[in-house]
């Protein structure tokens, strides 16, 4: 009897080992080779990969070299700085080529018609890859940004009401209040002689305060520790992703992995405090629901699922959504505001043009009204041009979950497609000879191909759920600041864009503020 049990256990053990071995070989060898063969048959090649590391070492060396020096002046020809591997290999292999992230093949695609087809028509059979999900697992988890399939549909449906209709307009009051407080503080600081301001830091604080108040019923001061931890966690996760292509790397007790684990634990502890505080209000009878902001909608749904014995929307998912929107809701908008302020400070003619428009629409001392934001056409052009030159992300990734057809190209299941947004936004073929110059008028004189040439918020059903929120917020903040201050570039500003998940100014953006007479 005992011998039979031992034999059975041995069979199970050996079968499991063989299965794991086969899956590993399939994942890291058989599937990549199959994809490589299919793409080569279509004439799509790329730089020769090294065993295990693929092209990672080459990319890392090129990026390190190109970004090691600051720009010698303020210019916007930054594709070669941030995506030097794309520049080199697109010249050699054309508009389609394969790059290897370890043993993971990635198709770099810049043909805008094919990109539109992918984003508009194939969203149901494409999404985030396993490697992407692992890379952000400890940062934003499996929230909306990283979800796929039915999970994505459910989460999108759940969050959508917080970003539409009258509820969206209702957030304007908080945006105006938070911005007015910033103006008061800056006026006081400038009045005391501190007229140089690192505007990036101010924009991050401001957008963090706004997203806290509008989506989570909190404030930046309460969430200050959370935002600080999230910022460090973002950097550490970005640094750790370069090792993901090596099997088992995420389990190693490395310095990065230990620090990531500790930061994640602290972030989730702080989130639980915010969540529990909201739940306590409802349980103590202060409110019949958890509220109608994003956190309230998530908690209300969690209660429904609990009553239906459905555990899909558990506490971990709520925390993942909170991390996703804390990050996406303030980081990308803060960077949009930072780069736009830099561009306006460096282009006084456009700064004055926008200022005159704001005064014409709102009056010299009037506060922005959400119903009149559409009249700020010059400001809209400037914001679009800022998003074109400095999009929040340099790349837009998608993985094919089944074989699909893009034009004349067959995309095999398991192939990741990487869309170099920055390169598309700076393409002279698409935007003209002045593609690397600041020219907001390009968004007024002729229509632009949103969804193909211009994709700062992605496109199709999986576009950014908060883009209207972000644009409304940006217009309110910029309209307020430009009506109260004149800003010029400080001599201490060093132009050095870098990529840490998003495009950031390496040393911040220092501007000189001068209060305007009302």
From Swiss-Prot:
Group of enzyme by EC: oxidoreductase
SUPFAM superfamilies: Cytochrome P450 (SSF48264)
Family matches, as CDD domains: CYP72_clan
Induction (UniProt): By trans-zeatin and isopentenyladenine in roots. Down-regulated by auxin and abscisic acid in roots.
Compartments, as annotated in UniProt: Membrane
Catalytic activity: N(6)-(dimethylallyl)adenosine 5'-phosphate + NADPH + O2 + H(+) = 9-ribosyl-trans-zeatin 5'-phosphate + NADP(+) + H2O; N(6)-(dimethylallyl)adenosine 5'-diphosphate + NADPH + O2 + H(+) = 9-ribosyl-trans-zeatin 5'-diphosphate + NADP(+) + H2O; N(6)-(dimethylallyl)adenosine 5'-triphosphate + NADPH + O2 + H(+) = 9-ribosyl-trans-zeatin 5'-triphosphate + NADP(+) + H2O
UniProt-listed Enzyme Commission number(s): 1.14.13.-
A GO term for molecular function: monooxygenase activity
Alphabetic keyword roster: Heme, Iron, Membrane, Metal-binding, Monooxygenase, NADP, Oxidoreductase, Transmembrane, Transmembrane helix
Keyword Protein transport found: no
Signal peptide from the UniProt entry: none
Membrane-spanning parts: 1-21
KW Transcription regulation (keyword) present: no
Family, per entry: Belongs to the cytochrome P450 family.
Protein name: Cytokinin hydroxylase
Organism the protein comes from: Arabidopsis thaliana (Mouse-ear cress)
């Amino acid at each position: 009897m005992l011998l039979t049990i031992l034999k059975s256990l041995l069979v199970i053990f050996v079968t499991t080992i063989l299965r794991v071995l086969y899956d590993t070989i399939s994942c890291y060898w058989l599937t990549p080779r199959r994809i490589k063969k299919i793409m080569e048959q279509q004439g799509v090649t790329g730089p020769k990969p090294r065993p295990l590391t693929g092209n990672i070492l080459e990319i890392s060396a090129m990026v390190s070299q190109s970004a090691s020096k600051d720009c010698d002046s303020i210019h916007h020809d930054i594709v070669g700085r941030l995506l030097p591997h794309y520049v080199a290999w697109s010249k050699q292999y054309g508009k389609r080529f394969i790059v290897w992230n370890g043993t993971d093949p990635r198709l770099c695609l810049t043909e805008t018609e094919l990109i539109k087809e992918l984003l508009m028509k194939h969203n149901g059979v494409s999404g985030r890859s396993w490697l992407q999900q692992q890379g952000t697992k400890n940062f934003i988890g499996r929230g909306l940004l990283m979800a796929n399939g039915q999970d994505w549909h459910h989460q999108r449906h759940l969050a959508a009401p917080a970003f539409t209709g009258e509820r969206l307009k209702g957030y304007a009051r908080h945006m105006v209040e938070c911005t007015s407080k910033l103006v008061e503080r800056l006026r006081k600081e400038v009045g005391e002689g501190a007229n140089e301001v690192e505007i990036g830091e101010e924009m991050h604080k401001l957008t963090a305060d706004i997203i806290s108040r509008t989506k989570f019923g909190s404030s930046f001061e309460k969430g200050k520790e959370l935002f600080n931890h999230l910022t460090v966690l973002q950097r550490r996760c970005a640094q750790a992703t370069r090792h993901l292509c090596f099997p088992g790397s995420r389990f190693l007790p490395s310095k990065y992995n230990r620090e990531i684990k500790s930061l994640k634990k602290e972030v989730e502890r702080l989130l639980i405090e915010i969540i529990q505080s909201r739940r306590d209000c409802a349980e103590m009878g202060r409110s019949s629901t958890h509220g109608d902001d994003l956190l309230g909608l998530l908690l209300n749904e969690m209660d429904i699922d609990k009553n239906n014995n459905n555990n899909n929307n558990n506490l971990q998912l709520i925390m993942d959504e909170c991390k996703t929107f804390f990050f996406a809701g303030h980081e990308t908008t803060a960077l949009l505001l930072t780069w736009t302020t830099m561009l306006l400070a460096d282009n006084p003619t456009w700064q004055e043009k926008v200022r005159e428009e704001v005064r014409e629409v709102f009056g010299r001392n009037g506060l922005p009204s959400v119903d009149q934001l559409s009249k700020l056409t010059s400001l809209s052009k400037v914001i679009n041009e800022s998003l074109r030159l400095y999009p929040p992300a340099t790349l837009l990734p998608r993985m094919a979950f089944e074989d699909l057809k893009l034009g004349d190209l067959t995309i095999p299941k398991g192939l990741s497609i990487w869309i170099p947004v920055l390169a598309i936004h700076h393409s002279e073929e698409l935007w003209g000879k002045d593609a690397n110059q600041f020219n907001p008028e390009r968004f007024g004189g002729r229509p632009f191909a949103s969804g193909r040439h211009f994709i700062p918020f992605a496109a199709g059903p999986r576009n950014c759920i908060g883009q209207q929120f972000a644009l409304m917020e940006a217009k309110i903040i910029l309209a307020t600041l430009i009506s109260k201050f004149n800003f010029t570039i400080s001599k201490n500003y060093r132009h050095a864009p870098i990529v840490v998940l998003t495009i950031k100014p390496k040393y911040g953006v220092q501007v000189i503020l001068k209060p305007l007479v009302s």
